[in-house]
Amino acid sequence: EKIKKWTGFENTISFKEFHKFYMGDLHFGNCAGCDILKGENIDVIGTPHQPEWIYKLFAYSLGYDVDDRLKPNTQVEHNGFRFYFMTYTDKLLRAIQFYIIESELEQAVGRARLLRCDCVVNLFSDFPLRQATLKEAKYDTE
C-alpha cells in the first residue's frame, strides 16, 4: 500500500495472493501476451521465485543431476549489476533460476509496451533487469 501511495500508479502486477491490494486481473504467471495495460504506467512489485524443485526438475530434464541448495545473501553479477540474492553456487542451477525469474519479470514489465508507448514502469524487486535504471527512493521513509 505504501508503494501504491508513493507512486500514484493505478496499475500493478504482483503476486496473485496480493490481488486484494491492487486493481486489475494480471499477476505473475498470468500476464504473457496481455495488451490491456499498453501505454499505462505500471508498478511491478516482487520477485517471482519458484519452488526449488522446479529449478532442479528443469535441470534434470536437460540431463543434469545437480545437488545444490539455495544460499541466502550470495553476491552475484548479472545484467551488469552486482547484487545479493538467494541463489545457487552451481552455475547451471543459477542460470536456470535467473532465466525463469527474469522471463517472468520481463513479461510483467513488457505489458506497458515501453518501446512503443510513452509510459513508466516501476520495478520493485531484488532482481534488476537489463534495461533498469536504479533509483534511490524515499517512499519508505514517509
Predicted regions and their residues:
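ASCE RecA-like P-loop NTPase motor cores
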Residues: 1-142
